[in-house]
């Protein structure tokens, strides 16, 4: 199959290493009161930019995942959780082709904030898989999937430096600077961006 760049799903923008991919803010009313404007300004300035620091773990063994490949997983761990570097583990091994850092991939995924334990995105909840380029996602996502295989279910935990720190967290405030992100990803298919297979001599 061919997974074209044009097939990128807008709802998966949290995965993309691009700033400003959140929804536009609602239009302001024609004549807002001075009091409401001041309150909004004060609330914005008071919003936290980072959670208190957490001693990072060097293992993801404490993250428990239940559910079969293809079904939305349940992810549980003790919060707040932080990881020292991007780490990944194959939970269910597939037998398909190996994923490279330049592939387009067709995946289902669920993302949970390591600090709060709250789910911030899930393709399963939208009822459709996501097609994206591993060259256009946050570093931790690329690191976690490179070298895995089609048919794998993969657990990935990434520190904020490999997540959304560079964009100041998520636009909706569900992810702050420094937050570790935990993903479970089912790799459904890939598309090659370079020649592959066995060379045949005429």
Task: Name each model-derived stretch.
Residues 2-202:
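Cross-family detector of peptidyl-prolyl cis-trans isomerase
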